[in-house]
Structure formats: C-alpha cells, structure tokens
C-alpha cells in the first residue's frame, strides 16, 4: 500500500479561493494589494518564476508591479529601484528575485528592503522577529510546509521532526516555526556535516528534505508510517527530481510529491503575505 499524497496543488487552490474574497474586500475599501518584483538579468528560470507569481496575482485581483532590469546594471541602480518600491504606495509588498548576478551583493540588497514590505519574510529584521515569535511576514516555503501538514491532519505537537537542510529559506525558519509553543515539535536540523544521517531520519515522525540532492532520502532511511515532505529540486538530464527517492512511497505514511507538493504553496503564501500586509495583520 502506497503513501497518502500531500497534495500541494489542491491545497493551493483552496487558499486562492479565500484570497480572492479577501482581496475583493480590500479593493472595495480602497486598499487593493500590490505585489512588486525586482528581476535582474535574463535567467530563464527566474523569468519563469516571476511570470508565475504575477499570473497568480491576476487570479485573485492583486496588482502586479514589475521592475525588470538589465543584467549589467550598477549596484546604485538596483538600490534606487528598491528605494522606489519602498516609497511606492501602490506596492504593499515585494521581492528581489534571487539569485542576483554575482557582482551584486544579495545580502546588501535584501537589507535595503523595507521590512514592512518584505513579501518573502527573509529580511534580517523579520527573521529576527521569527526567532522572538513576534508578528512578521513568514518565509513562504516554511509556512507552506506547515500549512500542508495541518491541512492533512498530520500531528505535529510532541513529534520528532528531522529537517535535512539548514538554508535560510527553508531549514532554519522551518525549525523555528515547528518549535513554537503552538506547534511544540522537537526538531533535529541536519546538514552536510551531519554524521550517520540515516540513524537520525529513522527516528523521525516527520522528515523534511530540503537540500537539492537528487534522491538523497531512500526507503531504508525512513521509519514505516513516517511523514515525508520533499522540498529540494535538482535537474537530472532533462527532468526535475526531488530529494526523496520513489521507493520511499512504499514505506512512508504520507509523502508530498515533487513537483506538485510544496512548490505551489510557496507561491500562494507569497500572495498571502501581501494580503495580510494590506489587512494590517503582520
């Protein structure tokens, strides 16, 4: 018997219906939310991501604000564009699409984003608020994972969660979310320096794989009935694959597919952050 699918697409569609209603109410009160994006260069993947985000905006009535910049812009021009969106009253929240060209300092750019307009939840101030459990926009992927688990009735309180990956977009913020009193999980954060990874994953009630190593997590590393969330994406020849080997589906109780699991929720929680900023809930 195979695992139950944690369907991110169906869950996303439920959230989009709710967001459309909330955006309509905001628009009626004269506060239409606006999502801005700053995109530098001509990377096909980045352009595809940005197009998808603005297509999502159109579905729910959020205003799209695009700032597409050439690959050879100066640091000063990038910073001026950030300041322009900081001051733009039509822009409720925005993102700087990563990665930036190597000659541009990503951390310096992100620090210039107004924390009150940080749609990604990755500004240092907002990450600090996450540590303190004070209100702030939450990192979209980590928030999406938590919502997906709740949507399928996965018990979190008192469980042992093993997160593979310590990145700032997934691993670290997810660990902070799961150890809040409202979740009360016990978290082990693993990474490239972890010895005997399988010994830890076999103890886990929930495993989140977010390192971008193709099929890193195999069936012999998973306790029967465990919940497995596949976040990492890698390109192998002509196709995209996740961190979780297909044989895990025969052992685990629940598995999120990849693609189609967490990815759709990352995008929809970007919109959710913007709507909540417009509502004054952050």
UniProtKB/Swiss-Prot annotation:
Statement: the UniProt record of this protein carries the keyword Amino-acid biosynthesis: yes
InterPro entries (alphabetical): Aminoacid_DH-like_N_sf, NAD(P)-bd_dom_sf, THF_DH/CycHdrlase, THF_DH/CycHdrlase_cat_dom, THF_DH/CycHdrlase_NAD-bd_dom
Positions that bind NADP(+): 165-167, 192, 233
Species classification: Bacteria, Bacillati, Actinomycetota, Actinomycetes, Mycobacteriales
Protein name stated in the entry: Bifunctional protein FolD
Subunit structure: Homodimer.
Protein function: Catalyzes the oxidation of 5,10-methylenetetrahydrofolate to 5,10-methenyltetrahydrofolate and then the hydrolysis of 5,10-methenyltetrahydrofolate to 10-formyltetrahydrofolate.
Family as reported in the entry's similarity comment: Belongs to the tetrahydrofolate dehydrogenase/cyclohydrolase family.
CDD domains named among the record's database cross-references: NAD_bind_m-THF_DH_Cyclohyd
EC assignment: 1.5.1.5, 3.5.4.9
Highest rank taxon of the organism: Bacteria
Alphabetized GO MF terms: methenyltetrahydrofolate cyclohydrolase activity; methylenetetrahydrofolate dehydrogenase (NADP+) activity
UniProt KW keywords: Amino-acid biosynthesis, Histidine biosynthesis, Hydrolase, Methionine biosynthesis, Multifunctional enzyme, NADP, One-carbon metabolism, Oxidoreductase, Purine biosynthesis
Functional pathway: One-carbon metabolism; tetrahydrofolate interconversion
Coiled-coil region list: none
């Amino acid at each position: 018997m195979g695992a139950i699918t944690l369907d991110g697409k169906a869950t996303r569609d439920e959230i989009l219906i709710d967001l459309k209603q909330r955006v309509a109410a905001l628009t009626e009160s004269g506060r239409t939310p606006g999502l801005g994006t700053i995109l530098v260069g001509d990377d096909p993947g980045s352009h595809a991501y940005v197009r998808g985000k603005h297509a999502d905006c159109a579905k729910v009535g959020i205003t799209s604000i695009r700032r597409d910049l050439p690959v050879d812009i100066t640091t000063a021009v990038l910073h001026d564009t950030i300041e322009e969106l900081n001051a733009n009253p039509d822009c409720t929240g925005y993102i700087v699409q990563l990665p930036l060209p190597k000659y541009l300092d990503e951390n310096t750019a992100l620090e210039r984003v107004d924390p009150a307009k940080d749609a990604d939840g990755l500004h240092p101030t907002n990450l600090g608020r996450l540590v303190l459990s004070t209100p702030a926009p939450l990192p979209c992927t980590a928030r999406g994972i938590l919502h997906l688990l709740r949507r399928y009735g996965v018990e979190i309180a008192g469980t042992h969660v093993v997160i593979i990956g310590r990145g700032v977009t997934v691993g670290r913020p997810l660990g902070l979310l799961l150890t809040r009193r409202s979740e009360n999980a016990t978290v082990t954060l693993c990474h490239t320096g972890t010895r005997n990874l399988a010994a830890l994953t076999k103890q886990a009630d929930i495993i989140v794989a977010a390192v971008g190593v193709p099929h890193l997590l195999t069936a012999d590393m998973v306790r029967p009935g465990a919940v497995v969330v596949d976040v990492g994406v890698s390109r192998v020849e002509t196709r995209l694959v996740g961190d979780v080997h297909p044989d895990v589906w025969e052992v685990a109780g629940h598995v999120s597919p990849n693609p189609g699991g967490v990815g759709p929720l990352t995008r929809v929680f970007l919109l959710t952050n913007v709507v909540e900023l417009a509502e004054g809930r952050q």
